[in-house]
From Swiss-Prot:
It comes from Salmonella typhimurium (strain LT2 / SGSC1412 / ATCC 700720). This is Phosphoethanolamine transferase CptA. Belongs to the phosphoethanolamine transferase family. EptC/CptA subfamily. Keywords: Cell inner membrane, Cell membrane, Lipid biosynthesis, Lipid metabolism, Lipopolysaccharide biosynthesis, Membrane, Transferase, Transmembrane, Transmembrane helix. PANTHER family: INNER MEMBRANE PROTEIN, PHOSPHOETHANOLAMINE TRANSFERASE EPTC. The chain crosses the membrane at residues 17-37, 45-65, 69-89, 119-139, 154-174. One of its GO terms (molecular function) is phosphotransferase activity, phosphate group as acceptor. It comes from the Bacteria.
Length: 577
């Protein structure tokens, strides 16, 4: 009798486990594998989708005899969520994220209807059918995964502990992070897996929305600038501010770099007298949010919190009677980018062109060209347009189309001693600069084609060290170990003939002035003809009263952390520092 019972006891099957894994992985990992194989992002999403899809094995291990029912119920939820995410990727080439939720909730009913109607195409129907058939076929292959007691409980707990409980315990009790930050970190890891991209996306969206609304309400409560006057006349005009990303001028041929990385801007500079190139502008912070909190407000290194207590550039232009626009190819609703969204919401109309889940994904700045043309055609008599680019942000090869790697494999004008990976990054950065040149030049040309009355100013938020400074082993930005290339930025001004005729200025004597972009609001006010209490013409690079001052860099919130940029040692004399 005992022998018979032993023979009929169900045995563990690796094959059954394999089919169960394939089934649950299918709903998340297929999309992440496509994203990775097509070169649109790295391996993090693929890794996390594999890990967190494995959580669905727990009920399968605990109740092996009901695997078909459990898998069917869970599968319907996973199928619906993953099909929506897959369809979104097929249409837009982007992952679903909290930024998508933000854009969807910000649209009106008609826009939302148009947005959703794009799903009902023949292509999407065929994708949905194939996807559904594959899911059903995998479901039919499922068999019970028998794990003897007590191992089934131990294995199930190990999965739960390793993926959920351990990260929470480590962050909360060992690293002493708040529960909010702990859950936010866990949510970002779970996001690539269905249906967590919707659950965590909504959680993160609500979290950032609360912070966003608090900052916007505080901004709305600020008093307007006192004794405000616009001396530029009443003629219709369009003023444009283009903000780049991670672009150091030392790698631009426009500034003397031997590789031809900016051919279109080079040509414009030679042929168009309206383009002025300023040669000695630096940023105060090597990070996007931190510098824009200064460049777009009255804050600076000595008064870093004034962005919270004084009006911004966007507030100022609305006070001057401009209809204001914000066009961005940066991510929208992320913990890091909430302040950017706050700035954007201070304008009348926003265009959010990048809803990627991660910044390290293929997204091209050509996205901004169509909405820019549309805004130029807006009938408002006074328009102020901000265009925020991804520029040359790391990962550099994701900033330009794959077939436009002009400098791939090149070794000319390369620092000595670079490894093959470092050489690839060095060349990728030059390729990204080349594409950035096309985008910035296109914006200038599209603006010029409207025969505008106004000006366009372009600068990059900060620079980037890409093995430029000896010993040529540093890539990126580190405020605690600064190099000149992290802070040197392009600063270009294109003035239309109409604006120049009405407001004649000669900038030829200004181009070599030492300047910090943290003072940008004073230069912008000067160019736009705006005065008010707090405007300081000595802090405008284009004003005859300009006075050079110490260009502070560093973290203003750390004691004794500010240093004079001009005391930094020079690297190799390549390009402009």
């Amino acid at each position: 009798m005992q022998s018979t019972l032993l023979q009929t006891k169900p045995a563990f099957s690796w094959k059954a486990l394999g089919w169960a894994l394939l089934y649950f992985w299918f709903f998340s990992t297929l999309l992440q594998a496509i994203i990775y194989l097509t070169g649109y992002s790295g391996t993090n999403g693929l890794r996390d989708s594999l890990l967190y899809s494995s959580l669905w094995l727990i009920p399968v291990f605990l109740f092996p005899g009901r695997i078909r029912v459990i898998a069917a119920v869970i599968g319907v939820v996973l199928w619906a969520a993953s099909l929506a995410a897959l369809s979104y990727y097929v249409i837009y080439g982007q992952e679903f994220s909290q930024s998508v939720l933000f854009v969807m909730f910000e649209t009106n009913a008609n826009e939302a209807s148009e947005y959703l109607s794009q799903y009902f195409s023949l292509k999407i129907v065929l994708v949905a059918l194939a996807y559904t058939v594959a899911a059903i076929l995998l479901w039919t292959r499922l068999r019970p995964v028998y794990i003897p007691s007590p191992w089934r409980y131990l294995v199930s707990f190990a999965l739960l502990y390793g993926l959920i409980l351990h990260p929470i315990a480590m962050n909360t009790f060992i690293k002493h992070k708040s529960m909010e930050k702990t859950l936010d970190s866990l949510a970002s890891r779970m996001e690539p897996a269905a249906p967590w991209q919707f659950i965590t996306g909504y959680y993160q969206y609500r979290l950032q929305l609360a912070s966003l609304n608090k900052l916007l309400n505080e901004n709305d409560a600020l008093p307007p600038l006192a004794n405000f006057q616009d001396h530029s006349g009443d003629a219709p005009r369009t003023l444009v501010l283009v903000i780049g990303e991670s672009t150091q001028r030392g790698r631009m041929s426009l500034y003397g770099y031997p590789r031809e990385t900016t051919p279109e801007l080079d040509a414009l500079h030679k042929t168009d007298p309206g383009l002025t190139v300023f040669n000695n502008v630096v940023t105060s912070r090597p990070y996007t949010i931190e510098i824009l909190q200064q460049a777009l407000t009255f804050a600076d290194e000595k008064n870093p919190d004034w962005y919270l207590t004084k009006p911004s550039l966007m507030n100022m232009m609305k006070q001057a009677g401009y209809k204001t626009f914000w066009i961005t190819n940066q991510q929208t609703m992320t913990a890091r980018n909430t302040m950017l969204t706050v700035f954007s919401k201070q304008t009348d109309k926003q265009f959010y062109m990048n809803q990627q889940r991660t910044q390290s994904a293929r997204e091209y700045d050509s996205n901004v060209l169509a909405p820019f043309k549309a805004v130029l055609a807006d009938p408002a008599p006074k328009k102020f347009i901000i265009v925020h680019l991804l520029g040359t942000h790391i990962k550099y090869k994701f900033r330009y189309p794959e077939n436009q790697g002009k400098f791939d494999g090149k070794t000319d004008h390369v620092p000595p001693g670079l490894s093959s990976d470092e050489l690839e990054s060095y060349n990728d950065y030059d390729n990204a600069n080349l594409y950035n040149d096309y985008v910035v030049a296109s914006l200038i040309k599209d603006y010029k084609a409207t025969d505008p009355n106004g000006f366009l100013l372009y600068f990059s938020d900060h620079g980037e060290e890409v093995y430029d400074t000896p010993p040529h082993k540093t890539q990126g930005r580190n405020e605690d170990s600064p190099t000149r290339h992290m802070y040197t930025v392009p600063f270009l001004l294109w003035t239309s003939e109409k604006w120049q005729a009405a407001h004649p200025r000669d900038f030829s004597q200004d181009v070599d002035r030492k300047y910090s972009s943290s003072e940008l609001i004073h230069t912008w006010s000067d160019l736009a003809g705006l005065t008010y209490d707090g405007y300081d013409p000595t802090r405008s690079i284009t004003n005859p009263q300009f006075k050079e001052t110490t260009r502070w860099i560093g973290n203003p919130y750390k004691k004794n952390a500010l240093i004079d940029y001009d005391t930094l040692p020079y690297g190799d004399q390549v390009g402009n520092q």
